Structures are given as C-alpha cells and as structure tokens.
Regions:
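Conserved beta/loop motifs at nucleotide-recognition and modification sites
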Residues: 1-225
Length: 225
C-alpha cells in the first residue's frame, strides 16, 4: 500500500478532530500548530469550552508554559481528578519537547504513553515551531502513536473567499468573489489580519455592497502585496 502524503494525513486528522468535537468524543492528546493563529485560537477555545466549561471549569483546567512546565508538574496535573465534570484539560503552550534534557524527554514519553481517559492534554504552538525529531526515538514514537497532530496552515483562496463573504454578511454587507480575492491580495492572507480588516471595511462602507474604494481607503497593504 502506498504511503499517504503528509498533507493527506493532516487532512484526515482535521476531519477526525472536527467530527469528534461535534460528537463530544474528543481524544486525550492533541498537538495544535500552524501559522493560521485565528484557527488555532478558535479550536483551542472550542476544546476548552467542550471539556472545562462547567461550574468547576477553572479547577478542571490546568495551564503551563515553558517557564513552569516540567514532567512532574505535567504528571501531577494529569493525575488530578475532575471535579463536578467528566474530564479535565491540561494545556501546555510553546514547550519544545525535543529540546528538553534526555531524562525529561523519557519522562514525557512515558507520560504520553499512559494518559487517562478523563484527561485531555493539549500542546499549543504559537511562537515555537512544532516539529518531530525522529532521532529522539522514544519521544517521537510516543507522540506519533498517541497524539493527534493538528496543523492549521494558511487557507486556500477558495476557502478564504467563502469565509470573508460570511463575515461581511454578519455585518449586513455583500461582497463579490473578485473583491474577496483583492482583499486577500492586499493583506497577508491570514484570517487574523482579515478579520480586523473586514470589521474596518464594514464600518467604513456606506450602503450594503462592499466596494474596492472602501478596501483601498482603510486597508494598509501588506509588504508582499
């Protein structure tokens, strides 16, 4: 059987994740990365609300950064039983697992290989790039076997046009596909940037139809535009 390309695997991982999120059957280990910060933030928020949004939400949600995350601290948080809820959430931001000392890497590998069903561990990467280092075999194997890796990259022009149209519609504005493409060209094409520009354009534009003049008036062109 031919081996699947990385983008196929990534697409399948995202489809599975979205299906599990909708069904309320989230797994217990996710790694979220990619340059599209808007989507990263969106889905991290949805996971958090799904798992730790009850009356004891703060108690059931544990968060670490590179400054305070250690194997022992992570293990203690994972071992903490949920209060007035079915599950707990442990979020770790921007910790490069493969740059940890060998002893810590082995401890992390052991932790990831024995996660309880009541806990969802979420590693989120924003300022640090996530990349598996295959030379560190134990940790790499544990992540590949147990983690669902979700990469939110730059969206296609087609998907962005549909998304831009929906967001203008929320402002009671109409926009053509041609102007959606122009707005993408004028910006860096990232949804975080586009969301802010859409709000500005909608506030500036008089009448229901977005015009090129309104885009030119308020959008500061990206250096690459």
């Amino acid at each position: 059987m031919a081996r699947k390309a990385p983008d196929q695997d990534a697409g399948e991982a995202l489809r599975r994740f979205k299906s599990d999120l909708k069904a309320g059957t989230l797994g217990n280990f996710y790694i979220i990365s990619g340059e599209e910060a808007f989507l990263r933030s969106h889905y991290v928020d949805l996971i958090t609300k799904k798992i730790a949004d009850g009356p004891a939400g703060e108690f059931n949600c544990h968060r670490f950064s590179a400054d305070d995350c250690t194997p022992q601290a992570l293990a203690d948080a994972i071992d903490a039983m949920p209060m007035m809820a079915e599950r707990t959430l442990v979020r770790v931001d921007d910790v490069d697992l493969f740059k940890q000392p060998e002893g810590a890497r082995e401890q992390y590998a052991a932790i990831f290989s024995d996660l309880p069903d009541y806990c969802c561990v979420l590693f989120v990467y924003d300022t640090v790039e996530f990349k598996i280092n295959g030379t560190m075999k134990k940790l790499a194997a544990a992540i590949r076997e147990h983690a669902q890796i979700l990469t939110f990259g730059k969206q296609s022009e087609r998907d962005l046009c549909a998304w831009i149209t929906r967001h203008f519609r929320a402002h009671d504005k109409m926009v053509t596909d041609e102007l959606c493409q122009y707005l993408i060209f004028r910006t860096d094409g990232l949804m975080t940037t586009l969301a802010g520009e859409i709000d500005k354009i909608a506030a500036y534009q008089q009448g229901p139809a977005i015009t090129r003049g309104a885009i030119d008036a308020v959008v500061i062109p990206a250096l690459s535009a």
